[in-house]
Each structure stands twice: as structure tokens, then as C-alpha cells.
């Protein structure tokens, strides 16, 4: 017996049902890798960032997430190079899907009880996605921006419903705008922290501050 189609579970109807000590026997999700590519590249290496954003409230199966990750990774590896990007899957399949199996062979009516006790057993997992939530993100150099957008366009076909490809105004995976990042970088206020960055604030004694600037000389 094959897997029930994911369109049967597309709508979000029930409360979240995660794996727990009460919900046992859950099969492992198909997606096991959430960061692909040069995930250890510093924050200054990949300034460009593009997101694949969900435009509907729905369930996305772990099989669909894995298929989208493979499609995006394959295109970027072929056209941009395996060392030229960092792909991150931004949603995790924690919600457990159930199935109430029905027998369809001859004499099945003697064995099953129909809708009596129809809670069901775990069949798979999915991610509960809301409107405007980011599904996939890719950071790369500005020269590979068109490759990243095309890779996410191909990954879009693996998901149900509607998605949009949105080019981020931020620097890479950080929370800072590109113009602000460049300005603060020239002022030595940005401290690289892996794929993210820290902004040095205005803490410390008043004697270390310049008048009219929320910035410490001692931190530079």
C-alpha cells in the first residue's frame, strides 16, 4: 500500500501534534539536512540573499521539503559552483500526520470497525506554514544572484499552493540592511559571528563615548 497523497493533509485543521511520549512510533522525516553548501563561509563572503516565501497557510510534507532542497542544491551546484552558495531550509517538519487504515479486500467488513476508534496511527511528518513565512533561503555573491533566483523558482514546483521569491534587502542572513552594514563596517562597529554579525552598541562608561555618537571608541 502506497503513501496517501499529501493533498489530503494540505489544510491546517487541527492543533499541532508533535512527537512525544504519548505519540510514539513516528517515522523519521525524509529531510535530514537543513544547511547545504558553504555553511561555514563568513558573513562578508556572501552579501546577496533571496527567500522563497509561502503565500498560503498550509501543511508542507517532509518529502516536499527534501525534494525542494535537492532541486535547489542541484541547480546551484551546476551553474554557480558547489563553493559559491549557502542554502538553508527554514522550516522543520514537527507536526505528525495520522492515517486510519481501511481494509479493502474481500471480507474486510468483518475485520474493521469503520469510523469507530478512528484516531489513526502516525504516517509521516509535515511543517505547519503560515502566510509570509520563509521556506528556503539562499545567500551567495552578487554575481550569482540570478542563479539563486532561478534555483528557488525550480524549488517552487515541489510545494503546493503559492509561493513568492523575494530578494532580501539584508546583508546575507543577518538582520542589518546592506547600506547600514557597509556603513557600520567602515566604522568598525560590526563584529563577524559566523554567518551572522554583531553590532557593537553604546554600552560602557560615558568617558569612552564621543559627543553626539552612540558609539564607543574603546570597542574599535
From Swiss-Prot:
GO terms for cellular component: ribonucleoprotein complex; ribosome. It holds the Pfam family Ribosomal_L16. The keyword Oxidoreductase does not apply. One of its GO terms (molecular function) is structural constituent of ribosome. Keywords: Ribonucleoprotein, Ribosomal protein. The keyword Ribosomal protein applies. One of its GO terms (biological process) is translation. PROSITE patterns: RIBOSOMAL_L10E. Disulfide bonds: none annotated. Gene3D superfamilies: Ribosomal protein L10e/L16. It comes from the Eukaryota. Transmembrane segments: none annotated. PANTHER family: 60S RIBOSOMAL PROTEIN L10. Component of the small ribosomal subunit. Mature ribosomes consist of a small (40S) and a large (60S) subunit. The 40S subunit contains about 33 different proteins and 1 molecule of RNA (18S). The 60S subunit contains about 49 different proteins and 3 molecules of RNA (25S, 5.8S and 5S). Belongs to the universal ribosomal protein uL16 family. This is Large ribosomal subunit protein uL16.
Amino acid at each position: 500500500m502506497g503513501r496517501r497523497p499529501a493533498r489530503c493533509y494540505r489544510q491546517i485543521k487541527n492543533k499541532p501534534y508533535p512527537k512525544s511520549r504519548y505519540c510514539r512510533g513516528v517515522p523519521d522525516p525524509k529531510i535530514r539536512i537543513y544547511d547545504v553548501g558553504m555553511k561555514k563561509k563568513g558573513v562578508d563572503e556572501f552579501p546577496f540573499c533571496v527567500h522563497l516565501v509561502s503565500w498560503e497557510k498550509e501543511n508542507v510534507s517532509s518529502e516536499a521539503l527534501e525534494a525542494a532542497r535537492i532541486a535547489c542544491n542541484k541547480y546551484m551546484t551546476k551553474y554557480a559552483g558547489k563553493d559559491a552558495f549557502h542554502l538553508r531550509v527554514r522550516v522543520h517538519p514537527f507536526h505528525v500526520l495520522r492515517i486510519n487504515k481501511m481494509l479493502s479486500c474481500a471480507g474486510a467488513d468483518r475485520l474493521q470497525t469503520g469510523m469507530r476508534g478512528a484516531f489513526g496511527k502516525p504516517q509521516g511528518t509535515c511543517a505547519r506554514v503560515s502566510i509570509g513565512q520563509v521556506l528556503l533561503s539562499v545567500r551567495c555573491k552578487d554575481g550569482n544572484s540570478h542563479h539563486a533566483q532561478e534555483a528557488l523558482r525550480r524549488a517552487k514546483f515541489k510545494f503546493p499552493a503559492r509561493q513568492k521569491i523575494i530578494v532580501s534587502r539584508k546583508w546575507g542572513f543577518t538582520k542589518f540592511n546592506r547600506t547600514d552594514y557597509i556603513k557600520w563596517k567602515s566604522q568598525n562597529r560590526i563584529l563577524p559571528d559566523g554567518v551572522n554579525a554583531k553590532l557593537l552598541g553604546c554600552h560602557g562608561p560615558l568617558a569612552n563615548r564621543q559627543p553626539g555618537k552612540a558609539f564607543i571608541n574603546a570597542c574599535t
